[in-house]
């Protein structure tokens, strides 16, 4: 079983290194991280390339996340730990997304990954976290604030639904905490009133 765990964790982490924003910006012979906030995430991509190509970013990041959860789950299923495997795979793909060794450890903040981890593990958690994100975003136009509160809700969802499964619950807490940690600079700007509002559903560039 330990070999399956090691292989699953490594595969999930490496899948996390496949960053959608970096991949699509590379098609333009560019690097999204050289623009705006310097972050390899969906928001920075939309700000600099518009939302028409954002779908490809979403597909890549969603695909790698779901695949990581599935692979890790299948590896541990013979040992009776399918749910735990999916959750561990989700945690490691998020770590790989945030700290990608193949991209100089300059990755994204993990919000999109967190959403699809929630979908892969328990759709109820994903729906609640997404509802919080959208509610806060439409009320304030602050993607970062919606992301932080959505990530916090993700963790709370795992606590609520999996309090009887310590490993799954702890993985969920760590995932939410990691996403919040990745937004630490945004949190400081929010507190200082310097955070930039974003119109995700309005084209900036075509």
Predicted regions and their residues:
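Nucleotide and nucleotide-moiety/phosphate-recognizing core
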Residues: 4, 8-9, 53-59, 63-101, ...
């Amino acid at each position: 079983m330990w070999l399956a765990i090691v292989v699953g964790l490594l595969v999930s982490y490496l899948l996390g290194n496949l960053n959608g924003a970096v991949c699509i910006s590379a098609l333009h012979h560019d690097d999204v991280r050289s623009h705006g906030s310097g972050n390899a995430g969906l928001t920075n991509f939309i700000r600099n390339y518009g939302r028409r190509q954002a779908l490809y970013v979403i597909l890549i990041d969603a695909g790698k996340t779901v695949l990581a959860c599935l692979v890790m789950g299948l590896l541990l299923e013979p040992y009776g730990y399918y749910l735990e495997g999916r959750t561990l795979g989700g945690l490691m793909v998020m770590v790989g997304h945030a700290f990608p060794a193949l991209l100089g450890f300059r990755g994204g903040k993990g919000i999109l990954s967190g959403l699809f981890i929630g979908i892969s593990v328990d759709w109820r958690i994903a729906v609640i976290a997404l509802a919080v994100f959208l509610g806060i975003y439409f009320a304030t136009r602050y993607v970062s604030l919606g992301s932080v509160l959505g990530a916090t809700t993700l963790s709370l969802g795992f606590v609520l639904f999996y309090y009887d499964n310590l490993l799954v619950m702890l993985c969920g807490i760590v995932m939410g905490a990691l996403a919040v940690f990745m937004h630490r600079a945004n949190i400081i700007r929010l507190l200082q009133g310097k955070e930039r509002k974003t119109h995700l559903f309005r084209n900036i560039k075509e």
